[in-house]
Curated annotation (Swiss-Prot):
GO terms for molecular function: ATP binding; ATP hydrolysis activity; mRNA binding; RNA helicase activity. The lineage of its organism: Eukaryota, Viridiplantae, Streptophyta, Embryophyta, Tracheophyta. Residues 1-21, 40-67 have a biased composition (Low complexity). It comes from Oryza sativa subsp. japonica (Rice). This is DEAD-box ATP-dependent RNA helicase 52B. SUPFAM superfamilies: P-loop containing nucleoside triphosphate hydrolases (SSF52540). ATP binds at residues 213-220.
Amino acid sequence: MRSSWADSAANAEESAPAAAANHGNSRLPRSSYVPPHLRGQAAPAAPAQAGALPSAAAAAQPSVGQPGVVGGPRWAGIVNGGGGGGGGSVGGSRQGFGAGGRGGGGGGGGGAWNSRPGGWDRRDREPDPFANSEAAEVDFEGENTGINFEAYEDIPVETSGHDVPPPANTFAEIDLGDALNENIRRCKYVKPTPVQRYAIPISIAGRDLMACAQTGSGKTAAFCFPIISGIMRSRPPPRSRGSRTAYPLALILSPTRELSVQIHEEARKFAYQTGVKVVVAYGGAPITQQLRELERGVEILVATPGRLMDLLERARVSLQMIKYLALDEADRMLDMGFEPQIRKIVEQMDMPPRGERQTMLFSATFPKEIQRMASDFLADYIFLAVGRVGSSTDLIVQRVEFVLDADKRSYLMDLLHAQRANGTHGKQALTLVFVETKRGADALENWLYNNGFPATSIHGDRTQQEREYALRSFKSGATPILVATDVAARGLDIPHVAHVINFDLPNDIDDYVHRIGRTGRAGKSGLATAFFNESNTPLARPLSELMQEANQEVPQWLERYAARSSFGGGGGRNRRSGGGARFGGRDFRRDRGSGGGGYGGGGGGYGGGGYGGGGGGGGYGGGSSYGGGGQGFSSAWD
C-alpha cells in the first residue's frame, strides 16, 4: 500500500500532461521524485530555510532562483544546492543553470553542475570501484600483494631500440600524478612487476612500445598507468555535450568480450577520482546501454574490434582525437582472424597516423606476423621482452595420467575428492577443467553438480550475461570448479587457480601451454594434470619434450608413445626444438641483420626462433621455424 505522499506524487504525475497542455509553462510538468527512504513521511509544513530541503509544496512553486525540478534529488539539484539560489537541476527551466545550477545564487552551492571549469565533474558522483561488494570479491586482495616477488629477481629482460629510458624500481620514481598514485596504493600494489618497471617509463617518455610478457605479469597496469597519467597531464578542452559522437582520447583493443570487461574493470580502478572516464564496448550485449555510456563522455574506450567497427560505421565513435592506442593480446587477435579489422580501424578510419599518436602493443608471444603488423603501426619503437617467471619446476607441477575415455569421469572424481580433503577447512580449491567441445562442457558440468561438486561452465554458446555470471561465481568460490573450452577461457586473468585439469587434451601443444599457464600465475605455484590415451598419440612427443625441458618427471609409457609417434622422422605442427632462451619473442629487427636465414635463424625464446631459418634454441617457444626445422611453440602463458 502506498503512502499518502507517494499517492500524491503519482496523482501529480498522471495529471501533469493535461495541466501542462492547458497552462503552458505556468506550472511544473510533474512532481519531484520521492526517494524510497523518504516515502511514508509527512511533508514538512514549514517553508524551507536556506540550505534545507524544500517541502513538496514549495517545490511546486516555480521561481527564478529555484527552477522547477524534474527528476528531483537524482541530479542532486535540490539536496546539494540548498535554498535561496538553489541547486539547479537538469530538466528544470534554463534560468536555473545560471541562477543556482552552477553553484551561485543565495548560498545555493553546487548541484549537478559545479563551479569547476568544464561544467559537470564526474568525480562528484562517480561510483567507487573499490567499494566492498559481491562483484569485487578477489579483485584487489592479493593480486600484487600475493605476488611472489622473489621469483621475479632473476627474470631475464631484454630491450632494443635507441635511447631506452632506465627502468623504475618503485612507483614513487615515476611521475604518475597524485590521484593515480592514490589508486595504486588502494590497489595494494607494492612495487612494479618487471614488465611495469620497464614499460611504464618507456611509455611515460612518449615512445612507442612492443612489449612481450606473459599474461598475469601486470601488463594491464603497464599500459593503463601511462595512458591515464598522460590524459590527466594534457587534457584537451571539453567538446560540446550535445554531440552524439564520442571522441575518446585512448583506445584499448582486445580480442574477447571477457578480456575487454576485465581490462575495463581494472582501468576503472586506476582512473577513480581522476576525472578520466572509461567505457567498454563489446559484442554479445545490447548496444543501447553502451551508446548511452558513450554519450555521457569517454576518455578511454576499451573495445573488441567487431563492436568498435559497428560504432564507427554508425558514426557514434570518432577516432580523430586518439592520442594513445594499446593492443592487448595481439597474438590472440591474429589467431582469431581480427587482422583485417584492426588494419581498417588503425589505417583506414580517422585515427591519427603513427608518429602523431602513441602506440603500445602487448602480447605473450611475438612471431613474425605480429611483429610485421607492429612495425606497420609503430614509429621508432622500443622492443621489450620479459621472460617467464621462474621455471616450471618451481611454479607448475605437471602430471600426465593414462586414462581411457570411459574412465575419465571417475578419475576426475577421485582427484576432486582428494583435493577437497587436502584443502583448507575441507574447501574445494579453484579448479579449471578444460574440455574440447561445448556439449562436453555442459555434460560434465551437470554430472559434477549431480555428484555434489558445485560447478559452472563457460563456452562460446553461453550468452555474455551467463559467461560473466559464471566467471564471478568461480572467482568468488561459490562454484570452485569451472569447466571451460579453449576459446572461452583464453586471455582471462583468473587469480588463485590451484589446479588445471586437461580432461580432454588439445590437438596442439601451443594450446596445452596456454591452458596450464592459467595456474602458477604471478609467481605462485600450481598443479597441472592431463588425461592421456591413444587418441592423443600425436601430442606425445611435444608433450614429452616440454616436460623434459621443464625438468618434470616424464612417465616411461609417455616416452614410449613419443618414440613411436616420431618413428620415421618428425616435423609438423607439434615438433619442437630444445634450447634455453626464455622469452616470448625476439626483436626481428636484430634478426634481419644477423645470419641464419630468414627472420630469426639465430634462435628465439618463447615462440621466437626462425621464420625460414634453421630454428633456434628456445625454452618455452623453441626455435619456431616456418619452413625450417620444425615449429617451436609459443610460450603464451596466457
